[in-house]
């Protein structure tokens, strides 16, 4: 059983992420912004993967900030980004090394597959 930190500012999507993660047999840690993510990242305990929306509407932070802070605290943490924006070279250039991407909208099956791949 893995622990996945999901960061998403849309609470409906965040609740859906929790259900999918738990249906896969994993534990979900949830945050809607960088501050919430840092509470989990700075706490003791293992986190196996980070799933973050690139566009978070909290002032001054986004998924890139979440991922960069996560990697600073937990260098081996695999990261899966998501966004409704079309993936561009600029976006890819801001990914942490090894970062992956899942385009919104995605199906539950696509999310499940991407999360399982992230944890390999």
Predicted regions mapped to residue ranges:
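As written
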Residues: 92-102
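Conserved acidic carboxylate
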Residues: 8
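C-terminal output helix
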Residues: 106-118
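Conserved phosphotransfer cores of two-component systems
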Residues: 42-45, 69-77, 94
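Acidic, metal-coordinating helix/loop segments flanking the phosphotransfer/catalytic sites
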Residues: 30-49, 57
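Two-component/phosphorelay signaling modules centered on CheY-like receiver
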Residues: 11-30
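Conserved phosphotransfer microenvironments
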Residues: 53-68
């Amino acid at each position: 059983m893995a622990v996945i930190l999901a960061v998403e500012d849309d609470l409906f999507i965040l609740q859906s992420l929790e259900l999918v993660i738990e249906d896969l047999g994993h534990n979900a840690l949830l945050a809607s912004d960088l501050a919430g993510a840092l509470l989990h990242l700075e706490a003791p305990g293992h986190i196996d993967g980070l799933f973050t929306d690139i566009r978070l509407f909290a002032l001054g932070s986004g998924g890139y900030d979440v991922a960069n802070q996560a990697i600073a605290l937990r260098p081996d943490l695999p990261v899966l980004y998501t966004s409704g924006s079309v993936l561009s070279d600029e976006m890819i250039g801001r990914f942490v090394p090894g970062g992956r991407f899942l385009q919104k909208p995605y199906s539950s099956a696509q999310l499940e597959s991407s999360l399982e791949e992230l944890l390999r």
